[in-house]
């Protein structure tokens, strides 16, 4: 049976939640993960899968009102290796554009893979375009990201053999100009090719374009190097300069954070980048108030095993660490950066790159931080393992969140 992924968009107009919810401890599931998983940039779809719903009733969240529309269909289900990219924008007039990695083939080669695009003028959800049949690009691509650019335009970035961008001056209509190559880095130890991009724009008329990306180079069958980069355009995407990401200032750009484990947001002249997804490093946020010319670092979550070598016996711990898996970032109109992290439990019970992840209703949740805070997220009892812990033992058994 061919698997089809239906991409739908919901606009949340109301939300209410109760304060406490009791869950039995048996809901927790354990998984073994290898931190050195190779990501190659031409990831294969997972193939045919059947999903069986297991309905439950929960008082935690109730949607009061929501507009929803199906905007595209794809048989390619691997939309990210970690974070979801900037796949949607809403312009000042309410218009919404959505992109996704799209294919209509049911095989593993997905030669038609590329960017599917749909557009809704002025935010009227009854007036979405027809579901796309063909990709925007002329070649096989993946991992699209989109943003407004200029007075009324839009810019699309995706990866093939490196990164390219496509631009049009009027959002939602007209021909795309491209591909315009975003240069791969020069002077690096290995010949890295940029992939897995996230794009955002800032400045007057959104003409300054910021792209964060990762790259991976295979050294031999057992070793590879990954590195984080930042590309910037000051003319709406026509010309580019690529350099190391702001992580470079702390010597953390290489072999620390994973590809696809980063996010970017802009508002006015403010730019913020989030890096997480590493059990060997802190969760870091870099903020610029001058459109990406200079950066300041903030630690969102302090990893008690920051910088540890997996082969070091001191990296072994059986006392659960509540740590981040993925994250999201936004900047409000006052320039405040908001960070959300989803939380899992981790144990590294033996030397080596494998660790155990516990996820389930007694572990999952969302931790929040913003840069008005003067310190990273901390536990009230001072236990660094529990700084992101959201569920506590409840009287009478189970876990309580509230």
Regions picked out by a protein language model, each given a short descriptive name:
Residues 20-402:
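Extracellular, repeat-based ectodomains that mediate carbohydrate processing or recognition
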Residues 1-25, 117:
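Bacterial Sec-dependent N-terminal signal peptides
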């Amino acid at each position: 049976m061919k698997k089809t992924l239906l991409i739908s968009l919901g606009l949340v107009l109301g939300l209410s939640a109760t304060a406490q919810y009791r869950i039995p401890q048996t809901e927790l599931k354990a998984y073994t993960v290898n931190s050195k998983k190779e990501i190659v940039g031409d990831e294969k779809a997972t193939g045919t899968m059947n999903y069986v719903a297991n309905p439950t009733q929960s008082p935690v969240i109730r949607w009061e009102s929501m507009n929803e529309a199906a905007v595209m269909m794809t048989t390619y289900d691997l939309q990210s290796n970690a974070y979801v990219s900037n796949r949607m924008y809403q312009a000042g007039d309410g218009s919404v554009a959505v992109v996704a990695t799209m294919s209509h083939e049911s095989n593993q080669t997905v030669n038609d893979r590329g960017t599917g695009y749909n557009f809704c003028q002025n935010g009227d959800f009854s007036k979405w375009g027809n579901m796309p049949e063909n990709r925007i690009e002329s070649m096989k691509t993946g991992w699209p990201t989109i943003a407004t650019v200029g007075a009324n335009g839009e810019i699309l970035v995706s990866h093939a053999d490196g990164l390219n961008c496509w631009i049009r001056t009027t959002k939602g209509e007209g021909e795309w100009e491209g591909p315009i190559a975003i240069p791969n880095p020069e002077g690096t130890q290995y010949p890295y090719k940029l992939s897995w991009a996230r794009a955002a724009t800032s400045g007057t008329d959104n003409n300054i374009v910021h792209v964060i990306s990762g790259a991976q180079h295979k050294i031999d069958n057992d070793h590879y190097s990954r590195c984080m980069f930042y590309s910037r355009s000051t003319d709406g995407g026509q010309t580019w300069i690529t350099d190391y990401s702001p992580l470079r200032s702390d010597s953390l750009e290489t072999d620390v954070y994973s590809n696809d484990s980063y996010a970017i947001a802009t508002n006015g002249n403010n730019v913020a980048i989030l890096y997480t997804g590493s059990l060997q490093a802190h969760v870091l946020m870099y903020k610029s108030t001058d459109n990406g010319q200079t950066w300041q670092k903030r630690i969102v979550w302090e990893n008690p095993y920051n910088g540890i070598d997996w082969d070091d016996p001191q990296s072994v711990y059986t006392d659960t660490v509540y740590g981040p898996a993925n994250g999201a970032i936004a900047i409000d109109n006052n320039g405040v950066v908001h960070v959300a992290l989803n939380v899992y439990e981790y144990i590294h019970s033996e030397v080596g790159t494998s660790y155990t992840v516990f996820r389930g209703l007694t572990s999952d949740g969302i931790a929040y931080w913003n840069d008005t805070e003067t310190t990273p997220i901390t536990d009230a009892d001072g236990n660094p393992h529990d700084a992101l812990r959201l569920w506590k033992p409840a009287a009478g058994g189970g876990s309580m969140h509230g």
